[in-house]
Amino acid sequence: GPSFCKANGKPCSYHADCCNCCLSGICAPSTNWILPGCSTSSFFKI
């Protein structure tokens, strides 16, 4: 399931092998269209 970006240490990116992040810190694989983690308008790097 989703995890905290700081916890899994993955960079925030649009790449499928990276982590998608939002202001809440929740993230999920960018290929997961059901639970994408957050809107693309809220993406940022940690």
Curated annotation (Swiss-Prot):
Its main location: secreted. Signal peptide: none annotated. Expressed by the venom duct. The modification D-phenylalanine is found at F44. It comes from Conus radiatus. This is Iota-conotoxin-like R11.17. The cysteine framework is XI (C-C-CC-CC-C-C). Iota-conotoxins bind to voltage-gated sodium channels (Nav) and act as agonists by shifting the voltage-dependence of activation to more hyperpolarized levels. Produces general excitatory symptoms. It holds the Pfam family Toxin_19.
